[in-house]
Amino acid sequence: MLKVYNTLTRKEEEFKPLNENEVKMYVCGPTVYDHTHLGHGRTYVSFDIIRRYLEHIGYTVNLVINFTDIDDKIIKRSQEKGKNPKELSETFVNVFLNDMATLKVKPADIYPKVTEHIPEIIAFIEKLIEKGFAYKTENGVYFEVKKFENYGKLSNINLEDLISGARIEPSDEKKNPEDFALWKTAKPGEPKWESPFGEGRPGWHIECSAMSSKYLGEQFDIHGGGRDLSFPHHENEIAQSVAYSGKDWVNYWLHTGFVMVNGEKMSKSLGNFITIEDISKEYDPEILRFFFIQRHYRSPIDYTAESMSHVKNNLEKIYNVIENIRISLEKSEKSGIWNENEFLLYDILKNSKHNFYEAMNSDFNTVEALKSVFEVSNGVNKYLSLVKTPSEGLLLKAFDFFKIVGEIFGLFENYFKESSESNDEGFVKFLIELRSDLRLQKNYEMSDKIRDGLKELGYQIEDNPKEGTVFKKINI
């Protein structure tokens, strides 16, 4: 049973999507005015792993990642560079997509851009005005926060504390200091669109509400982003969207932790701002992915030269194990009597696979899941050092375990990109043959152990007098 930590309720909850076999997920994309940095990489690799795991356990995932391609920051940067805002944003859209490809992040199903959804945003704002949650001024349109009863629930912020001065935009035309902009009246020289509220452009928060509703509906399963977005961005999204539809909007809110550099927050002013483009020249993308999963996605992670060296060494060790398996398969045998070494590795493989899924089912806990990966690595190394002729079935099973890990974590691509079929079935047939031999020897205790072990791996076997022993895949 999959459980996820919901920022909204501050606890782990059983994951139940609105549609049984489909997950609708929206992850806030970048404001495209600069290069993709390490913090972005951590967020999108984390949600890539979450998406991969959901797909691995049988869900169809509909993922939307937006581009904020018009914003105060884009306008300011375009003026500094002497470029058109559209030209600037398109440049960094391409930078982002290239960086995600470098990091082996699977593409989203849809990448909507704000500038291509102005009519939907205007319609969204009109309905909020109609329902009494928003009001027009000469400067644009504002959402009246006091009209929304549960404001602050996601970020655990008290409205009175907010009014006293925390991260709000001042304006003489606001009814209340905490109200936020849905539409901004155009200033001279800025990009603008016609609207019932006058020429202008959307505010930041309304974009995601309008675009997510268009592609995922008025209710969906997962909304994600960096922890820094929980307030004010995600808090304001909730207020707008629930006010708009009158329905609960998102069931599960997931947020990634911050990336530190040598114990300090990453920033240009400190000179420790690291772009994906630059770091990819120094480290293989798989090393970066492996670095990110060393910490739980909700926890902060500290980038240091020492930590990267440690990560690189550990990843190389796993690659060496996979290579040793490949080489050892050439001298392995398909059948034979198992001794203590075979049964020990079999138990390690069975237990580690179980523990891996247990960890991933506990809010995608990659830290605990990695322990299982190292247990298998150590177990395989020890086994190969003790036997002259290894069991083909066991080696195939170990190989398949690393293939599963690679598919979920986006690793080991060099070994598995040409092999798309699992070795499970061959291993199951091998164990069934071994079990039959044990039953002939009246070693029922060990044959029952194999039967029970196969069930834990997701296979049910039946002894048929006419057809012999047959097996079928079951859900575990």
Swiss-Prot record:
Disulfide bonds: none annotated. The lineage of its organism: Archaea, Methanobacteriati, Methanobacteriota, Methanomada group, Methanococci. One of its GO terms (cellular component) is cytoplasm. This is Cysteine--tRNA ligase. Keywords: Aminoacyl-tRNA synthetase, ATP-binding, Cytoplasm, Ligase, Metal-binding, Nucleotide-binding, Protein biosynthesis, Zinc. The keyword Phosphoprotein does not apply. Its EC number is 6.1.1.16. A motif ('KMSKS' region) lies at residues 265-269. Zn(2+) binds at C28, C208, H233, E237. One of its GO terms (molecular function) is ATP binding. GO terms for biological process: cysteinyl-tRNA aminoacylation. Its main location: cytoplasm. It catalyses: tRNA(Cys) + L-cysteine + ATP = L-cysteinyl-tRNA(Cys) + AMP + diphosphate. PANTHER family: CYSTEINE--TRNA LIGASE, CYTOPLASMIC, CYSTEINYL-TRNA SYNTHETASE. NCBIfam families: cysS (TIGR00435). A motif ('HIGH' region) lies at residues 30-40.
